[in-house]
Amino acid sequence: MTISDKIRIYELSRDLNLDNKDILGAAQKLSISVKSHSSSISAEEAEKIKNLINKKNPDKKILSIKKPSIKKDNYKQNKEDKSSLISSVEEKPFKDNPEKKPLLKKPLNKPESLKIISNQPKSLNKPTITNSSQSQANLTNQNLNSKTSQNLNQDKRNFRNNLTPPIKSPTKPPIQLIAKPKNTTKNVQSNESSQNILNSGGGRQISNKPDQNSSKSKTKNINNRMSPPELVGAPIRREGPNKQNNKQKTSFKQTVPNRPGMLNRPGLRNKPSDQGRPGSFNRQTNTNRPGAPSSNKPGMPNRPGLRNKPSDQGRPGSFNRQVNTNRSGAPIRPGMPNRPGSKFNGPKSPGMRKPVSPNELLKLQKTNKSENDKQVINNNEKQNSETTKQKVKAPNSRPHTAPNSKKLPHRTFSNNSKKPGKTDWDDSAKLEALRNKNPQKQRQKVRIIGENDDSLTSETSGYSGEKFSILSASLARPKKEKSDESKSQKTIKQFKKKKKETTRQRQKRRAMELKAAKEAKQIRPEMIIVPEDNLTVQELADKLSLESSEIIKSLFFKGITATVTQSLDLATIETVAEEFGVPVLQDDIQEAAEKTVDMIESEDLDNLIKRPPVITVMGHVDHGKTSLLDSIRESRVASGEAGGITQHIGAYQVEFEHESKKKKLTFLDTPGHEAFTAMRARGTKVTDVAVLVVAADDGCRPQTLEAISHARAAKVPIVVAINKIDKEGASPDRVKQELSEKNLIAEDWGGDTVMVPVSAIKKQNINKLLEMILLVSEVEDLQANPDRFAKGTVIEAHLDKAKGPVATLLVQNGTLKSGDVLAAGSVLGKIRAMVDEHGNRIKDAGPSFPVEALGFSEVPTAGDEFEVYPDEKTARAIVGERATDARATKLAQQMASRRVSLSSLSTQANDGELKELNLILKADVQGSVEAILGSLEQLPKNEVQVRVLLSAPGEITETDIDLAAASGSVIIGFNTSLASGAKKAADANDVDVREYEVIYKLLEDIQLAMEGLLEPDLVEESLGKAEVRATFSVGKGAIAGCYIQTGKLQRNCSLRVIRSEKVIFEGNLDSLKRSKDDVKEVNTGFECGVGCDKFSSWIEGDIIEAFKFVTKKRTLTQE
């Protein structure tokens, strides 16, 4: 049993006749570490647990419910002595094996130890547990008599008078008893013990002639041993509902029970079975017989409304009449019987009701009723018994058993089982008849006790009329609203699965949706703006608020086949839009030059200082922009440009002494070629002052006007530099006149535009131009905050084979330092090094300072704004947000040339196949890539489509060669070189690699390549003309004698016979002879014979025209 003075939990529980869970709970209260019933504890710890269980301190709350095993011999002994018990208690014998159902007991402390004032509720001391075998040894069947019962009843009444119910309501919901629960005991204790328990727990009087001596001796024996009586069953508490109306109108106190310790519970007679729980087999007693005395037991209150209560758990006065007590804080053991009818076990039987508040019981226990009231109650019991005898049927024919439980015999209410003269159950006959009329409906209403117990009304709880109105509003639960059932039904209907719609219903619904969508799109916009001459059919339909099918149908009637993803040119868009009455406006190119980001923020206003101005030099090609900058910088940049034209944005900073102070100016040189429109717009976007260079001998040209529009879009002041005034034929006044037509009026003409005539070659008026620029910039009041993280714009970017991605950055606000983490568009970078325009390394760059920065993850897009962030995590998050848009933009650039126009699609339909020229474009900088792609868009593409498979800055690599070989593409390199191994790979794969330095030549060669893909045209070429002067018949045919008037005739050439200015025959010249000899051709002034196999009806005077078809190279034509 013990190992090294260790005791296991299950051994200790067996010794104490307790459940393992009780021992574990006691060990937990004593902080003894145990895990399960097989855990071992020391003898000292076991003694502590025993002392705690046997302790009678009322402050401790230890509730132990004992489930002792019942021996067979005890059961047999009880069975033999059962005859004495049957004389006072009517019950059916148990027929099941009693060994599997141990008797459940609930101990009780000695009544003398309880000194609790009823007005001050306190927690009830949890009774201790004693061994059932000891109780059985002391309580023998010989001492079972009525006197003992009466004496125990008197002790019980004393105990009840001092007992104050606990304030806490039961934690477990009431349990409805329908069938026998699992593990319910069937053992019958010794008759004396059983009778004592009936008297102490239920307060029932067994005999009309109690034996006082026997009662005293037995009570003394029990009290001395401190062995509380075992709980075998809970009696039925009944009331006389018609006897207490007068007192309940004025007081909550209910003092007179029907019998000592018995609660009056009308309506309990209709319960299907009360034997499904311990102690219910002694329910039918002879206490209602007419001769039974009604002793006044002050501790037991008369409790109306308890008739429907399934369980009296957690209330004083009822803890001895039940086993599965669930007081607040007491755990429910798995071995305890699960009563059917609880919210966990089954539907609630009719007549059961929710628990009554302990406060209500406290008020009901305070006073006793008089003897007169008792007599009235007994009389009413007789009347009710006679009335309800006819209407109440025995429920034993319909047994209810819980799962996995054995059947117990049900209590019968038949007339045969009643003793002569015994009064019937005290209840309202009408209410009983109503409940038994349709019990199934009643069960359905309260089938889930946990949810619907609030729906039990005052009638079902045993209170009716004025009795119910006496209860305090704080004690009674509110009624469940009648609308809850309808609401729940509506909710169920809402969650019901919808029927699957039929094909006809689906078609009808879709037709209605299409009609509604069409009506919603009837509102046409006032106008639409077409960006960059390109819109797909779907985009145009969205702008016009139309279905795409309407656009396709309109184009089809115009002889054009299109799809929803087809690109439309501006002319087609205007045609379609005018058909629907919507004008079209082309998106102005100047929008690219608008300043979209304000570099100065509100927190910078306190730390602003003056910054150098940024000046952008713009103008038409070959008007001397770079030469003017060379004169200012005193350098020779223009001579180094390929072809003498600028193809990059150059950023320079110049120091100029003005008013004995050195001033810094930042210049941006932009290309003047028409292909570099995006570069000019980008330069204008970041500028503070625009210098417009116009050649005095050439005047305003298209790019001059474009530069003016860029400057106006950027809202920057314009300074006009009239260059080349030293050349012959220069006319500055003519330039001023042309500019005045564009609303640029010179100051000497009364306008506000500064115009300075200069000569870049001879450096005339250069200082005056710089002074005017400084003057204009001072008016603009240019400021920045150097004490913040840098912000600015990417001017240019390219891929250097040694340095990696390199970007030209213009700092517009803040200070850029080495090591800063920045995000430029969707590109993340960390500055590894910075150099100025002279190639010198610098550590930081302030506002208006252009630098070349290294350290980007990839080549950034020119024109993107950059910003420095405090850490890489923040910058990476910003870059991630922009990644999607950047990928879409890059894809649009790569696929720009794939957009097929409608006219070229029509040509494809006519010719049978659309010619395509695949290109791979590599350039030195991102700006050059943009310029070339823009120029390719301007090429005629109605017959040959140019597809740019790859466009990126950087050198030509072997990967590019492999791509070109796989796709049959031509590689175009602009101002770039071939990587090591690329030339060898190109020769091996027979890939055509073209390198260019000037954009003119590049565009010309691409156009020639596109024309080379076109099939040549067959053109009719005239050979000569001859006149028929004689005819000769030869066999079946005829020969015409002709004279060559012009040109010549050739054998096998084509000829046309014209008679009276009408062509009567067209065919081949099959035979040509001169003087009977066959010849190949006959020239002008000679005579010859002409024969045709398919024509012989020659007439003198016919004209013969000889011609042949030759191929001619086709050229690209605009749409």
Swiss-Prot record:
Residue numbers spanned by region G2: 644-648
Span list, region G5: 759-761
Region G1: start-end pairs: 619-626
Compositionally biased intervals (Basic and acidic residues): 70-102, 421-435
Biased composition (Basic residues): 493-507
Region (G3): 669-672
Domain tr-type G, chain residue ranges per copy: 610-782
Keyword Nucleotide-binding recorded: yes
Listed Low complexity bias regions: 213-224
Cellular compartments annotated: Cytoplasm
Superkingdom of origin: Bacteria
GO cellular component: cytosol
G4: annotated span: 723-726
Compositionally biased residues, Polar residues: 116-153, 182-212, 242-257, 281-297, 319-328, 375-387
InterPro entries found in the cross-reference section: EF-G-like_DII (IPR053905), IF2_II (IPR044145), IF2_N (IPR006847), P-loop_NTPase (IPR027417), Small_GTP-bd (IPR005225), T_Tr_GTP-bd_dom (IPR000795), TF_IF2_bacterial-like (IPR000178), TIF_IF2 (IPR015760)
Region annotated Disordered, chain positions: 64-463, 477-507
CDD domains, per the entry: IF2_eIF5B, IF2_mtIF2_II, mtIF2_IVc
Binding of GTP, residues: 619-626, 669-673, 723-726
A single GO molecular function term of this UniProt record: GTP binding
Keywords linked to the UniProt accession: Cytoplasm, GTP-binding, Initiation factor, Nucleotide-binding, Protein biosynthesis
Keyword check for GTP-binding: yes
Function: One of the essential components for the initiation of protein synthesis. Protects formylmethionyl-tRNA from spontaneous hydrolysis and promotes its binding to the 30S ribosomal subunits. Also involved in the hydrolysis of GTP during the formation of the 70S ribosomal complex.
PANTHER family given in the database record: TR-TYPE G DOMAIN-CONTAINING PROTEIN, TRANSLATION INITIATION FACTOR IF-2-RELATED
Protein's name in the database: Translation initiation factor IF-2
Organism encoding this protein: Prochlorococcus marinus (strain MIT 9215)
Encoding gene (name): infB
